[in-house]
C-alpha cells in the first residue's frame, strides 16, 4: 500500500523507511552483536586489510539502486497522479545531497574522497526520504538527505570504534537513516497530506511509537535465530 498507517496511533511510513529498511537494520544489528566480528578484523596485524574487493563495482551498484529507487518510491504512490513528480524530485534531492554530504565529510576527515562515504551518503539519503517523500517540500527533502548521511556516517564510525563488525553497512544505512527518516515524517511532513488528523506533536509521538513497536517485534522474533547461527 502507499501508506502504512496504524489507525489507532496514526503512524505513517509512505514507502518503507521503517517497514522495509529499519526492519532489515534491526535484524542486522541483532545478528552482528550476537555473532561478533570476523576473525582478525580488529587485530593490529590485519589493520586496513579488511576492505571491499571492488569499489568501482560497489559504486556501480549504488547508482543502480539509486535509479531503482525512483520506481520504489514513485510506485508506492499506487497511481500515476500529480503526487508522483514531487515524490521523484524529493527522492533525487535527498540522494544527491546525501552524496555531497558524504563527499564533504570525507574531504574534511581524510583530505580526499573516501569511496565508502561516497557510497554511504546517497544510500542513507534515499533510505531517509523514503518515509516522507510524498509529504515534504523539496527544501525539507534536502535537509532530510543531509542529516541522513551524517547520521549514517556517525553510526558507522561508532560501530567501528566499539568493534562491531557490520560488513555491508546495513546498520548505518538501513537502521540509522531509516529511523531518522521515520522521525522526520513527524517533524516536517505536511499534516494535511498525511491525513492522520493528528497535531504535529501527536504525529511525532506516533512515529516514535511505531519505531519502538517494530524494534520490539523484530528482536523478539530474531534473537533466538541469531543465537542458533552462532552455535
Task: Enumerate the language-model features and the residues they cover.
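Structural signal for the N-terminal portions of transmembrane helices
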Residues: 83, 87, 198-216
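Cytoplasmic-side transmembrane-helix entry/capping segments in multi-pass membrane proteins
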Residues: 52-56, 113-122, 169-171
Amino acid at each position: 500500500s502507499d501508506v502504512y498507517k496504524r489507525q489507532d496511533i496514526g503512524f505513517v511510513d509512505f514507502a518503507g523507511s521503517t517497514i522495509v529498511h529499519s526492519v532489515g537494520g534491526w535484524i542486522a544489528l541483532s545478528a552482528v552483536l550476537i555473532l561478533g566480528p570476523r576473525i582478525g578484523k580488529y587485530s593490529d596485524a590485519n589493520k586496513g586489510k579488511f576492505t571491499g574487493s571492488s569499489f568501482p563495482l560497489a559504486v556501480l551498484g549504488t547508482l543502480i539502486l539509486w535509479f531503482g529507487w525512483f520506481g520504489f518510491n514513485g510506485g508506492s504512490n499506487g497511481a500515476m497522479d500529480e503526487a508522483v513528480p514531487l515524490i521523484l524530485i524529493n527522492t533525487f534531492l535527498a540522494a544527491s545531497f546525501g552524496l555531497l554530504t558524504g563527499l564533504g565529510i570525507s574531504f574534511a576527515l581524510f583530505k580526499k574522497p573516501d569511496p565508502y562515504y561516497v557510497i554511504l551518503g546517497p544510500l542513507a539519503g534515499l533510505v531517509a526520504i523514503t518515509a516522507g517523500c510524498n509529504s515534504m517540500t523539496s527544501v525539507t527533502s534536502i535537509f532530510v538527505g543531509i542529516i541522513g548521511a551524517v547520521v549514517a556516517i556517525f553510526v558507522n564510525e561508532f560501530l567501528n570504534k566499539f568493534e562491531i563488525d557490520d560488513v555491508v553497512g546495513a546498520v548505518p544505512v538501513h537502521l540509522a537513516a531509516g529511523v531518522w527518516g521515520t522521525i522526520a515524517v513527524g517533524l516536517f511532513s505536511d499534516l494535511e497530506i498525511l491525513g492522520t488528523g493528528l497535531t504535529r506533536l501527536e504525529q511525532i509521538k506516533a512515529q516514535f511509537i511505531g519505531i519502538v513497536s517494530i524494534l520490539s517485534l523484530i528482536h523478539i522474533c530474531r534473537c533466538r535465530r541469531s543465537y542458533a547461527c552462532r552455535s
